[in-house]
């Protein structure tokens, strides 16, 4: 990117309008680097609820008419993006578009955006408007107090496209303890030494992760990107990670450096990787040190500066 962030946050960004809901990065002080932000109100269920999206669209339309921005930056406003892409294709919307989430559209529509921010390099292949940025990891990592347990344990967390069946099978017979935290605990099979917890407050989730000897992110084989947030959180906590090869997280975990990679669905592979990291203190410490060195890549500050540089480039 030819643009570069300035020392003074927000300088040069008067022609950028952010449209988002107040969540994750967009609820942080780092997001205040962008001086003009339109936040949607969450009045019904999840932020992606249609009513919430309609209300944000109304507020966004008013702000666009008033400010006439040259760049529209879509944050956590996933369902609003397809409408913007249609308006851009019809040449009704003239502002340049930066999108940070592609849940509700694919590459066919993505080409109508000036930049689509994605969280793995694999997603940029053959897509000139797609740009890889490391995902910003959610959590106050400095304030995390690691969970204290009677014996070492492996931790796995998350919900989307998780392969907990393979993980639980891998732990069987090892005598190792495993703690799983997921929004859908009923989907996790019962297993020896396995403790399952439901949805947790973020800092409690991170405390369990921080207290683990090893973090495991078992992912299903899928073209859809997934698992980045949990992996980035583990790296920010300086944890050695076992995760799935080819599941779009290889930009985060390099085999033998930040952790170990296993083929999708490979029970024996997961068992060997987990047992190896738990038993080999030297390897585990080396992976933890590498993780800590990578942590700044996933900070809110780094993400904010990268988005700023991107917007400044489009404003040139």
Regions found by a protein language model. Name each.
Residues 104-106, 112-143:
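Donor nucleotide-sugar binding/catalytic pocket of nucleotide-sugar-dependent glycosyltransferases
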Residues 139, 148-205:
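Conserved catalytic-core segment of nucleotide-activated headgroup transferases in glycan assembly
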Residues 269, 276, 283-297, 306-309:
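A short, well-ordered alpha-helix in the C-terminal region of glycosyltransferases
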Residues 203, 217-233, 246, 250-251:
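Nucleotide-sugar-dependent
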């Amino acid at each position: 990117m030819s643009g570069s962030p300035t020392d003074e946050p927000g300088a040069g960004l008067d022609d950028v309008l952010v449209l988002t809901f107040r969540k994750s990065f967009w609820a942080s002080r780092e997001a205040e680097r962008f001086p003009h932000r339109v936040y949607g109100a969450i009045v019904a269920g999840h932020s992606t609820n249609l009513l919430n999206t309609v209300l944000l669209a109304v507020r966004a339309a008013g702000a666009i008419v008033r400010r006439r921005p040259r760049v529209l930056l879509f944050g956590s406003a996933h369902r609003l993006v397809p409408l913007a892409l249609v308006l851009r294709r019809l040449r009704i919307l003239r502002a340049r578009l930066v999108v940070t989430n592609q849940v509700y559209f694919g590459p066919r529509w993505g080409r109508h955006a000036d930049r689509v921010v994605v969280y793995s390099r694999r997603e940029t292949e053959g897509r000139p408007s797609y740009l890889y940025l490391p995902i910003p990891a959610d959590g106050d990592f400095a304030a995390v107090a690691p969970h204290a347990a009677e014996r070492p344990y492996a931790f796995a967390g998350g919900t989307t496209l998780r392969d907990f069946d393979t993980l639980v099978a891998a732990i069987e017979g090892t005598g190792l303890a495993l703690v799983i935290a997921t929004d859908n605990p009923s989907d996790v099979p019962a297993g020896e030494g396995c403790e399952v917890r439901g949805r947790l407050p973020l800092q409690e989730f991170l405390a369990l992760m921080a207290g683990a000897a090893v973090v495991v992110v078992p992912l299903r084989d899928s073209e859809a990107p997934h698992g980045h947030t949990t992996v980035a959180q583990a790296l920010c906590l300086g944890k050695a990670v076992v995760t799935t090869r080819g599941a779009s997280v290889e930009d985060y975990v390099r085999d033998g450096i930040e952790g170990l990679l296993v083929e999708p669905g490979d029970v024996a592979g997961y068992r060997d990787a987990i047992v190896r990291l738990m038993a080999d203190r030297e390897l585990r410490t080396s992976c933890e040190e590498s993780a800590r060195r990578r942590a700044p890549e996933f900070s809110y500050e780094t993400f904010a500066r990268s988005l700023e540089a991107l917007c400044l480039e489009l404003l040139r």
